[in-house]
Amino acid sequence: MPRSTNKGPFVDHHLMKKVDQAQKEGSKRPIKTWSRRSMVVPEMVGLTIAIHNGRQHVPVYISENMVGHKLGEFAITRTFRAHSGDRKAKKEGEK
């Protein structure tokens, strides 16, 4: 069930404070955050936010298309290891 429109978007206070400060200074340095649950708001457009994926901080440049989505959507947490193929079929194809 989606969040009520009466409440508005959720953004952690500490993250919003850093966003406001970066906009005042015109800083291009990435803002480090662990808050994957925060929603992207129009004030963040043009900033680079380093989102934690459980292991490291992934730098993400915020564009207008991202507004309304959660930060966690842009920093994947799982790495895909390809399934091992049929070795016998590979060897026959090489011959």
Curated annotation (Swiss-Prot):
Keywords of this entry: Ribonucleoprotein, Ribosomal protein, RNA-binding, rRNA-binding
GO MF annotation, one: structural constituent of ribosome
Keyword Lipid biosynthesis: no
Family annotation (SUPFAM superfamilies): Ribosomal protein S19
Domain of life: Bacteria
Cellular component terms (Gene Ontology): cytoplasm; small ribosomal subunit
Signal peptide interval: none
PROSITE patterns: RIBOSOMAL_S19
Matching Pfam families: Ribosomal_S19 (PF00203)
Matches recorded under InterPro entries: Ribosomal_uS19, Ribosomal_uS19_bac-type, Ribosomal_uS19_CS, Ribosomal_uS19_SF
GO biological process: ribosomal small subunit assembly; translation
UniProt keyword Ribosomal protein present: yes
Functional note: Protein S19 forms a complex with S13 that binds strongly to the 16S ribosomal RNA.
HAMAP family hit by this protein: Ribosomal_uS19 (MF_00531)
Protein family (similarity comment): Belongs to the universal ribosomal protein uS19 family.
Record protein name field: Small ribosomal subunit protein uS19
Protein source organism: Coxiella burnetii (strain RSA 493 / Nine Mile phase I)
Gene: rpsS
